[in-house]
């Protein structure tokens, strides 16, 4: 994101809380280190972890435990309506059958950009306070080497500050971060381009991206030769929401609409943080609200 536009209070609430309680982020970090921790806090570590088999293992496990019959996949022509305090959701399933479900509650976790075509029963003026949220497009590049010969990638990786004027946003050392991500002696990197800093990267061809990555990666990691066995490019549209100065207005409108349409619960990365941990935390909160 663009640091000049991000509002700490919304984008980094934990840092903002430290600043409010202790006067500054640095002072707060130091003083909190001496503060007596609860038994639950003592269980928390800062160790980076993932899921065996990748994050799809997590969603697959949730899918199975929740009961596959609870899900309808491959739907189209989704049209929710709000009538007499109920949600009437019409759609076509994967067999092109027309189905209507009547529900007391409706939960959305899609991006803000899709709500105007999804929640058509809400007036455009109100929804625009939510759908005007900016998103950064990101290009993800995965590099894999069977026999790495360059700087030792022992660590997390790093973000690249804008002052360096590079075309990369950052590099993650995936094979150091997570176990069993590569064959024995293999090395895996994930690179990011684009974002609010370099939005033009998203529109570049794969050949252009490859040329940029080779130049930047060789400069950063100093391999004796650049011949990755794996070179994969993924384009992610609307990847990262930008919590700017209008965020407070957006959050207020979410609350207003949820009060106006009883049973409507609006989630997703348009509120509550942008990271994976934020999504898991919010998922539990939404489930508790829906069951309440």
PLM features: residue spans?
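Nucleotide-sugar-dependent glycosyltransferase donor-binding/catalytic pocket residues
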Residues: 51, 134, 272
């Amino acid at each position: 994101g663009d640091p000049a536009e991000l509002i700490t209070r919304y984008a980094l609430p934990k840092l903002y809380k430290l600043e409010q309680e202790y006067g500054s982020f640095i002072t707060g970090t130091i003083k909190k280190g001496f503060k007596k921790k609860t038994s639950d806090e003592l269980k928390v570590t800062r160790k980076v972890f993932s899921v065996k088999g990748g994050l799809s293992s997590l969603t697959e496990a949730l899918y199975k435990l929740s009961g596959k019959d609870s899900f309808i996949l491959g739907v189209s022509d989704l049209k929710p309506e709000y009538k007499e305090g109920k949600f009437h959701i019409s759609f076509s399933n994967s067999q092109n059958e027309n189905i209507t479900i009547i529900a007391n509650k409706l939960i959305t976790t899609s991006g803000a950009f899709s709500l105007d075509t999804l929640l058509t029963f809400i007036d455009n003026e109100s929804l625009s306070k939510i759908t005007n949220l900016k998103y950064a497009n990101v290009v993800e590049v995965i590099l894999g080497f069977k026999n790495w010969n360059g700087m030792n990638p022992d660590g997390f990786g790093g973000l690249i500050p804008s002052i360096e004027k590079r075309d990369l946003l950052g590099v993650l050392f995936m094979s150091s971060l997570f176990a069993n991500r590569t064959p024995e002696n293999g090395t895996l990197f994930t690179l990011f381009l684009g974002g609010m800093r370099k939005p033009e990267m998203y529109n570049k061809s794969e050949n252009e991206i490859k040329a940029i990555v080779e130049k930047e990666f060789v400069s950063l990691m100093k391999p004796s030769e650049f011949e990755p066995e794996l070179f994969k490019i993924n384009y992610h549209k609307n990847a990262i929401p930008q919590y700017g100065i209008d965020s407070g207005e957006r959050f207020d409108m979410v609350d207003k609409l949820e009060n106006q349409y009883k049973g409507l619960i609006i989630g997703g990365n348009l509120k509550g943080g942008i990271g994976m941990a934020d999504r898991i935390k919010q998922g539990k909160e939404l489930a508790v609200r829906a069951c309440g």
